[in-house]
Regions:
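N-lobe entry segment of adenylate-forming
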Residues: 1-34, 38-53, 74, 555-569
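Conserved pre-ATP/AMP-binding loop-to-beta segment of ANL
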Residues: 18-21, 142-160, 166-167, 177, ...
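Conserved AMP-binding/adenylate-forming core of the ANL superfamily
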Residues: 23-71, 92-96, 100-101, 149, ...
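Conserved AMP-binding/adenylation subdomain of ANL enzymes
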Residues: 179-196, 203-248, 263-268
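AMP-binding/adenylate-forming catalytic core of the ANL superfamily
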Residues: 243, 250, 389, 394-395, ...
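Gly/Ser/Thr-rich phosphate-binding loop
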Residues: 247-251, 263-351, 365, 373-374
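Conserved ATP-binding/catalytic segment of the ANL
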Residues: 356-360, 364-365, 372-380, 384-444, ...
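AMP-binding/adenylate-forming catalytic domain of the ANL superfamily
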Residues: 468, 475-480, 508-533, 547-564
Length: 569
């Protein structure tokens, strides 16, 4: 069997332990599960149906709600040798519809598939797409005698990044890079065959698809799934599912752990058993040291061990994994001088900014480079993170110039083939620290400020804004000025001016920032990606064009002159 082919591994598992549970999905109707034998047969049957309609290598758009049907159809695509293109189902969210239309326009799929009850809705959402697409429901056909024989360098699927909808970028994941990254993930977490996973993450995002579905199947393990909507409504259900199925591995962004701390009641906590959870993986967004402490303290009574918490770093462009905390060791938290950090240096300090280390890179080569010159920087210096090695994707679908710029990094000494991540970070005693995104960096009066630091400081600034998101960026007027867009609960906001002054006071006291421009908006006004990350550049553009619906704005005369002339409010 081809060792660089995921389906060959799945076929072997189906032959060796056909009756072992592979995947389970829980919703309000209960639990449905598939064994390896059932899952493999479903993939071959859907693969047979696909093979009658499209040629190997064709793209197929997959827009499914959470559930087992997506799993079967995605694996059916691999079995038929067609290129799956996972995307969110375009429900009531205009963001999801824009996202799907952008993905469809870029990928030019031959088919668009969804669940039978949703065919009409998806067809309507795709109206006007280029090329014109009508949705279908995949069916079970005559099973393929065996999965399609693939070349290691051929495409397995397109993973679209969570950027702006006008810049949909499909990361080309080959069969080689998929299998390579699954090996890297298993090594990072020190996982054995049969490992048990649990997840609520969406399947159209890399962490949900690769880490929480394909990795357990690659290992002959089991994964228990639920929908993101159910998690957001009832965070306790995720932890309950982990305990009920004895999951060892589950991953989520930082906000999910804070949500559990805030929303899980004492009675729910009493009923939880988290003693099996050995890998509490935190990643996909900036990791807060305080979140790690709060989560470990809150759920210790449920059997959670503090050394089970891990911090990880990865991205779609590496198929997922880059680095992670060593198993059995809590993440390294290092306190650095914030003023030195503004000068791109990590200087240890007794008090200051707490940085969470994302482990030591193992299978991949990681260096810190000057983003302008490509010169490798020494330990403790902040620069752009460059990566080279197994799992790095083949580039962006039909974007040769972006592929060259991003995947063709060459150092000042002539070493080539590096992925330029666009992330800022540093290595210290071998540990990788992430400090922010280059494009999000706020530069004011020569100071480099990281927006997520400022946003985090505003979490508890006022009852009307408690645990509500904020978005910090700078605008040129012509000198850079800071803008804070803060979501608020209007019913708890008696005095907008008072909140503005509290925001300015916090930023002045903690960061030495002068009078910031403040825009107070309703919940949901700050734009996010489909994975929940704040879209700072899009929110900035909306602010600049007057496209945000504001409760109240407190802006400097220069910002008003540049960005509010001709706009209401």
């Amino acid at each position: 069997m081809n060792s660089m082919d995921f389906m060959s591994t799945l076929s072997r598992h189906a032959g060796e332990f056909a009756d072992r549970r592979a995947v389970l999905f829980r919703d309000r109707r209960g639990e449905q599960a598939l064994t390896y034998g059932e899952l493999h047969l479903a993939a071959l049957r859907i693969g047979g149906w696909l093979a009658e309609r499209v040629e190997p290598g064709a793209r197929v758009l997959l827009c499914y709600p959470s559930g087992l049907e997506f799993v079967e159809v995605f694996l059916g695509c691999l079995a038929a040798g067609v290129v799956a293109v996972p995307a969110p189902f375009p429900d009531a969210s205009s963001l999801h519809r824009e996202r799907v239309l952008a993905v469809a326009a870029d990928a030019e799929p031959a088919l668009a598939l969804t669940s039978a009850p949703l065919v009409e809705a998806l067809t309507a959402a795709l109206a006007g797409s280029e090329p014109g697409l009508e949705a279908q429901a995949a069916e079970y056909g005559d099973p393929l005698p065996r999965p399609h024989v693939t070349e290691p360098g051929s495409l397995a699927f397109l993973q679209y990044t969570s950027g702006s909808t006008s810049d949909a970028k499909g990361v080309m994941v080959t069969h080689r890079s998929l299998v390579d990254t699954l090996r890297v993930g298993a090594e990072l977490l020190d996982l054995r065959e049969g490992a048990r996973f649990c997840s609520w993450l969406p399947m159209h995002h890399d962490m949900g698809l690769v880490a929480m579905l394909l990795l357990p199947l690659h290992l002959g393990g089991a994964t228990a799934l639920m929908s993101p909507t159910d998690f957001l409504r009832h965070p306790w259900l995720w932890l309950d599912l982990i305990g009920r199925h004895g999951a060892e591995v589950s991953a989520a962004p930082n906000f999910a752990y804070d949500l559990c701390v805030r929303r899980v009641t004492d009675q729910q906590l009493h009923d939880l058993d988290l003693s099996s959870w050995k890998h509490v993986c935190n990643g996909a967004e900036p990791i807060d040291a305080g979140t790690l402490t709060r989560f470990a303290d809150r759920f210790a009574a449920a059997g959670l061990k503090p050394e089970s918490l891990t911090a990880g770093y990865g991205m779609a462009e590496t198929t997922l994994f880059i680095s992670g905390t060593a198993p059995g060791h809590a993440p390294v938290v290092t306190t650095v001088d914030p003023w030195a950090l503004e000068r791109d240096t990590l200087d240890l300090a007794a008090t200051g900014r707490a940085l969470v280390g994302c482990g030591r890179p193992r299978a991949l080569q990681v260096l810190i480079a000057d983003p302008d010159t490509g010169a490798e920087l020494p330990e403790g210096r902040v620069g752009e993170i460059w990566v080279r090695g197994p799992g790095v994707a083949a580039g962006y679908w039909r974007k040769p110039e972006e592929t060259r710029r991003t995947f063709g990094g060459t150092t000042a000494t002539g070493e080539g083939g590096f992925l330029r991540t666009g992330d800022l970070g540093a290595l210290l005693e071998g540990e990788l620290y992430i400090t922010g995104r280059i494009k999000d960096l706020v530069i004011v009066n020569g100071r480099n400020l990281y927006p997520h630091d400022l946003e985090r400081a505003l979490t508890w600034v006022h009852a009307a804004a408690e645990n509500m998101p904020s978005c910090v960026f700078s605008v040129a007027v012509p000198r850079e000025e800071i803008v804070v867009v803060q979501e608020v609960r209007s019913r708890a906001l008696a005095s907008p001016g008072e909140l503005v002054e509290e925001i300015r006071s916090v930023l002045s006291r903690k960061f030495g920032v002068g009078a910031a421009n403040v825009c107070l908006v309703r919940p949901g006004e700050i734009r996010r990606t489909t994975s929940g990350k704040i879209r700072r550049q899009v929110t900035r553009q909306l602010f600049a064009s007057g496209g945000l619906t504001a409760h109240h704005e407190a802006l400097s005369p220069t910002v008003i002159a540049h960005y509010r002339k001709g706009h209401d409010g």
